Structure formats: structure tokens, C-alpha cells
């Protein structure tokens, strides 16, 4: 962008050297970080100092025409000049979407205040999720250095705005399938109560009740996606059939594992609902998920699983009780 400046004759300023002008420029020129987009500026121009106004307008990169008539010059005191923003040194500003405009970008008066008057910017939109706050200029705009620390903890806190419905399973997963799916292993077919269609013939599968009633060694199926969220919830069990109770490995004592109190109470209530009088020992049954995370870093805390049991209703609990009460 090329601009031509026509310098008017200055009064009583011929003796100023170029170094003095450069020094006054460095005093009046704002640093690049403070150059903001100002839509309208009302300058206060003293009538007896027209040269000072020309220096300030020349420093800001704005060409304004000054007339010699005193009426027009006095009218400049109340006139609003719509200034044109000129990029210096070919600096490029990132374009900000219109829906994410924030008061901190056009704040000509109170940019020294600690907090801005506007609401905080939207961190998550339904379309883009966390990517809407990818730029640091968008995330921490309008904040001083003392406010950044609290804002970072507020944004990065994983307990903020966590929707538990993302852990919900589809309704079809609560019901036992008529035909075993690919995620159901052959060892697990015995646990399906109801009619199953195998080899073209319909027969009733009677579950084999081993001495270890509840299955252990929870196995995860392949990662599935439901409604856009990654679903890591368990789908199959590997039944641990042992003929000798002495041959079974001695489980670790519960005191050496991380235990969630809510999960343990929910597990005791579940065992009472399925007519099992005493809860099973640690590391047996669903309670071996109480280590909270598995080797791949996936959440295995049973708190979410028991919350799904409450939402699913009594149908799944009845099926679990029916699978135990069927005679061999």
C-alpha cells in the first residue's frame, strides 16, 4: 500500500533536526502489541498547536486534510474521523469468525483494567468441540498475566461440563441378542438365556453354572462408536470355569487396590438385587474393574457401569438373575 503525504509548511519548527523528530516519534508511537482496530476516534485538537496534531496523525499512519479556514478547523474539535487502518511492515492479522467476537478486540478505553465487561468466549461449540479454542489469542484474549493461571485451570479441568450420556450404551446392547454377535465369544454362549439360532435350528441354550458363579477376566471387544463418542464399555465376559476351588489363584487383598466407595456400595446393592446374599470377593466378577484404568488407559471404573444399570431398568438385572437360577 503506497500513500503520498503532502507536508504543509510548519511554523517555528525549521530548526528541529531529524534526530529530534525521530525521538519524538518513538515517544508518541505505540508498540505493535497495542495497535488495535478503532472504528472511530474523536481527537482533541488545540487551536494554537496545529503542528502537534499533524505529528500525531502522521505517526498513526492516517492522512487527514487540514484547511486554513478557522471555521472548519474549529469544527474538527467535535468531528468524528473515520480512520482507515493501515498495516505496518506487512503484518498479517488472523481473521476471527464473526460468532467468536469478543470485547477484548476493540477495547480503546479500558484495556488496562483487570477484567473485561463482556462474557467469556464460547469454548465449545456443538460442531467443532474443543477445536474452537485452538488459538491462544482466542482463548486468553482480554486477560492479564495474573488472570491467566485461573483461566487455564478452569479450561483444562476435566470435571467441567462432562456429559455422562456419552458413556451410555445403546438400548440394544442391554438386551440379549437372538443370535450371538461377533463380539460374543464361544465360551460366552452358555450365558445367553433364551432361544438361539445355531446351524439353522432353533434350540434353547441352558447356561452352565460353574463353581465360580460370577465371571472374571473382563474382556473388551473392539472399540465401537455410538453417537459420535468412542465407546469403551465392556461387552463380553470370559467365564472362568474351575473344577477345583483350590486351584484358583488367591485374589489380592482389597486394601492394596484403589477402591471407590460409591462403586463398592453399588456392587453390594447389585448382588442383593440378583439374589446373591453376599458380595463376591475383590478381583472377582465386575468388581475387578475397580482399578479405575486398564493398561491402555481406558476408563474401567464401575461407577459409570452401575449408573447405566440404574438407567437401563430392571430388565438386565432380571436376566442376570435368570441366568443363575436356570437348572443345569
UniProtKB/Swiss-Prot annotation:
Give an example GO molecular function: G-protein alpha-subunit binding
What biological processes does GO assign it? regulation of gene expression
Q: Superkingdom, according to UniProt?
A: Eukaryota
Signal sequence span is none
Describe the effect of residue 83 to A: Abolishes binding to fbf-2
Which cysteines in this chain are paired by disulphide bridges? none
Positions of region (Disordered): 56-78, 108-135, 177-200
Q: Where is the composition biased (Polar residues)?
A: 178-200
According to the UniProt entry, the note on domains is: Contains two Lys-Xaa-Xaa_Leu (KxxL) motifs, which are essential for the association with fbf-2.
Query: Could you tell me what this protein is called?
Result: Lateral signaling target 1 protein
